[in-house]
Amino acid sequence: MRLLGIETSCDETAAAVIEHNIEGNSQILSNIVWSQTDNHAPYGGVVPEIAARAHVEILDDLILKALTDAHTKLKDIDAIAVTSGPGLIGGLLVGVMSAKALSLATGKPFIAVNHLEGHALTAVLTHNVAFPYLLLLVSGGHTQTILVHEVGNYQRLGTTIDDALGEAFDKTAKLLGLPYPGGPALEKAALLGDKNRISLPRPLKGEKRLDFSFSGLKTAVRQAATAMSPLTENDVADIAASFQAAVTDTVYDRVHLALQYFTHQYPLSHYKGRRPPALVVAGGVAANQAIRLTLQELAHQHGFEFIAPPLSLCTDNAAMIAFAGAQKFARGEKNSFDIAPRSRWPLDEKAAPLIGTGRRGTKA
């Protein structure tokens, strides 16, 4: 069967076509992503209204290109999967309404996909990773460790109680006067800096809870930058390097605990003679090489296989949405048109609220 996937949850507009067979294997036939980076660069961050308007302007063309590149006609599509949350509500509305319109016009099933589930299952698409596995999802909007038991069964072990890691990277980069997008710019600056020059906190390090926190680190960076003002290029590089070192230390500590939790539930002795369990990283921040190397080392220490999907599939894309939709469709799941997009949509909605959920409910 062939599925069309649509993704408009933030500042990438994407459409893709995949082919999914009865054995459960999938092939990406097309995967088109249009980035809005240039639209948002003058503002130093994503502007929701601009993002939504950009989705409206380009989505139809991207869907057509995805179908053309896949040598597929709309009538040959078996189902339409679309990100329905979490994300920016304006962008989600564009994608969901487009998918519903196509579904209504063609009679093809409509499938609402959780954006986080798309990230969670990407390693199954790219590496055929076996269940269960541990996922670290790090992006501009999310920082979570998730125990992926099987399709549809996700246990969130820890989440950020304030800023997501990608958000912390971008805001720190902006504070240092680095260009947007901030994550890659800060990583580049850090290569030239002294990571030991500035003492920065490692939030929650050593605590038994599995959550993350980055707002205090961001505040410490601001205080250091203010004390050193005006900043030279060397100052910026040293602050960037010190910040990145603090982040990697924090990630190491948090994921180390999550791996211990995993092996308590699924002892490594069960994997003797089999492929070891996997530590998977996904999300835009997975492009950071310092974090990747830290996770690779950590996985090796714990006897895990380290898996990082290609960067094009770590960041937001529609192939992962089509694949997640295929899993649901293969199990007979589809949605009615009365489903609405959700700005917040945790993978484990039935779980007890975590610390830091805020007045608006559990962080997605």
Curated annotation (Swiss-Prot):
GO biological process annotation, one example: tRNA threonylcarbamoyladenosine modification
Name of protein: tRNA N6-adenosine threonylcarbamoyltransferase
E.C. designation(s): 2.3.1.234
Coiled-coil residues: none
Job of this protein: Required for the formation of a threonylcarbamoyl group on adenosine at position 37 (t(6)A37) in tRNAs that read codons beginning with adenine. Is involved in the transfer of the threonylcarbamoyl moiety of threonylcarbamoyl-AMP (TC-AMP) to the N6 group of A37, together with TsaE and TsaB. TsaD likely plays a direct catalytic role in this reaction.
GO cellular component annotations of the record: cytoplasm
Enzyme class per UniProt: transferase
One of the record's GO molecular function terms: N(6)-L-threonylcarbamoyladenine synthase activity
Binding site for substrate: L137, V138, S139, G140, G141, D170, G183, N288
